[in-house]
Amino acid sequence: YCAIVGCGSNEDGRSPSLTMPSYEAQYKLLSHVCEKSGILPSEIDYVEAHGTGTKVGDPIESHAIGDAYGRSKGVRGPNDPPVLVSSVKGNTGHGENSSGIVSIIKTSLMLHKRKLVPTVA
């Protein structure tokens, strides 16, 4: 259904709380994975986000995604389609240990069927 051509993880250890993500760490990770995989940031059309639905974490994550792959830093032009972002957690809730594989399955099926799954608000 799809090929995973790159992945990565990081942890910078510097944020005001254990559950608060770091914009800098997320932005660096998104950029590094593209570079390591030989994919231009402008070629990213969809991001399956962590998207836990927190008031602090989601804005930080979406800002990093927008800066890494979107128009805000000139990665895309004004006439280019936007980067689509979603998270399976809006459909299923947080699966804790299984949430990563559920995200991969959802994204694989979306690519295979060429259809976007709507996010439940």
Set out the residue ranges of the language-model regions.
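Condensing-enzyme catalytic core of the thiolase-fold
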Residues: 1-121
